[in-house]
Amino acid sequence: GIYLFADGRIQSYEDCSTKEEGINHIYDVKAGEKKINEIKFVPDIGNEGDDLSLRFLFVINPDTVPDKESFVYAHDTNMNQVYPINIHMNVESKNKGGTEKNIVLCKEMTQEEYDSKVYDKYGKYRNTLDTADFVMKNNNDEEIQNYIKTDNGVLNFVIEGCGGNNDYYNITAYINGVVLEKDIFNAIFQIQRGRYITKKAFDVDLTKLDKNKYKLGEYNSLFFVAVPE
């Protein structure tokens, strides 16, 4: 699966070979095979004269859903991102540069938070101050797995971020490879270097999702992507 981001915002794009448009295009690539695809899109952010950061995210087997509990199970163990490319806007974006930001501001870390370490995707402890790191937790401040299994259609979780350089990060969440639209989930984190942390709780109404994409009472994959604006 290939996703496209402009200044951290996910973009819908057209695959010129199939004429299909969407935020995620899935390609079947055999071992040792090389594929070249032409795409086109109109950014939904940016004004004339702006320079936007363009990033692609590759997710291997995006339709895979876990069938058992596993700490290390997550699509981010199979993610690859190319280096950002800057594009120059010669015209206004299709929404004339409109921005609907839900910014989560930083707060000063407590000493306990400052001294703490978190698991990386391989289950190893590491400090988060040198590089930006985001953790998904439940409301009891416990890290949760990258799968979800709910019976009532409501998902409650907290995203916590810290470390790295001063920057804004656009958070995009996916369930079974399908993006959660902005009316369901929308957040931009502001990271400040040093002893600062961002934290925001989310209550996601999964009943708004396509019933063919999310199954109540069954395991569903959940991951989110933090991309600098």
What label would you give each PLM region?
Residues 1, 155-163:
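Aromatic/hydrophobic beta-strand junction motif of beta-rich domains
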Residues 1, 12, 49-51, 165-169:
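Short acidic/proline- and small/hydrophobic-mixed sequence motifs that coincide with surface turns
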Residues 3-5, 170-174:
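Beta-strand signatures of extracellular beta-sandwich domains
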Residues 7-8, 175-180:
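Short strand-turn-strand beta-turns centered on an Asx-Gly dipeptide
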Residues 13-48, 182-209:
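Intrinsically disordered, low-complexity Pro/Gly/Ser/Thr-rich segments with frequent PxxP/GP/PP motifs
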Residues 44-56, 64-67, 208-223:
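Short glycine/proline/serine/threonine-rich loop/turn segments at secondary-structure transition edges
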Residues 65-120, 229:
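Short beta-strand elements
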Residues 116-150:
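N-terminal edge beta-strand
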